[in-house]
Amino acid sequence: MSNEINLQEFKMHEKDSGSSSYQIARLTQRIAHLTEHLSTNKHDVSSRRGLLKMVALRRKLLDYVKREDMAQYQSLIQRLGLRR
């Protein structure tokens, strides 16, 4: 994959796996991987459904971060290269 995301920079501490920023970064990584998969496997409907669920979850998490901490939201959008 060409757009590897360094998940370590999104962790709040060493064992962090639940913070919103880490979850969003991890979902972005999985979404990119699935998008690449679906470009070659156009008829994989179950993966497409999973992709849509991941995109919706990332959207909800981004809305939460935006509501709670606008500076962190702006930083996440910029570092992950998301359109908003």
Curated annotation (Swiss-Prot):
KW Cytoplasm (keyword) present: no
GO molecular function terms listed in the Swiss-Prot or TrEMBL record: rRNA binding; structural constituent of ribosome
Pfam families in alphabetical order: Ribosomal_S15
InterPro entries: Ribosomal_uS15, Ribosomal_uS15_bac-type, uS15_NS1_RNA-bd_sf
UniProt keyword annotations, A-Z: Ribonucleoprotein, Ribosomal protein, RNA-binding, rRNA-binding
Domain of life per record: Bacteria
Coiled coil residues, start to end: none
GO biological-process terms attached to the record: translation
Matches recorded under SUPFAM superfamilies: S15/NS1 RNA-binding domain
Gene Ontology annotations for the cellular component aspect, listed alphabetically: cytosolic small ribosomal subunit
Keyword Nuclease among record annotations: no
Function: One of the primary rRNA binding proteins, it binds directly to 16S rRNA where it helps nucleate assembly of the platform of the 30S subunit by binding and bridging several RNA helices of the 16S rRNA.
Family classification: Belongs to the universal ribosomal protein uS15 family.
Subunit structure: Part of the 30S ribosomal subunit. Forms a bridge to the 50S subunit in the 70S ribosome, contacting the 23S rRNA.
NCBIfam families: S15_bact
PANTHER family the UniProt entry points to: RIBOSOMAL PROTEIN S15, BACTERIAL AND ORGANELLAR (PTHR23321), SMALL RIBOSOMAL SUBUNIT PROTEIN US15M (PTHR23321:SF26)
Protein name as annotated: Small ribosomal subunit protein uS15
Gene name of this polypeptide: rpsO
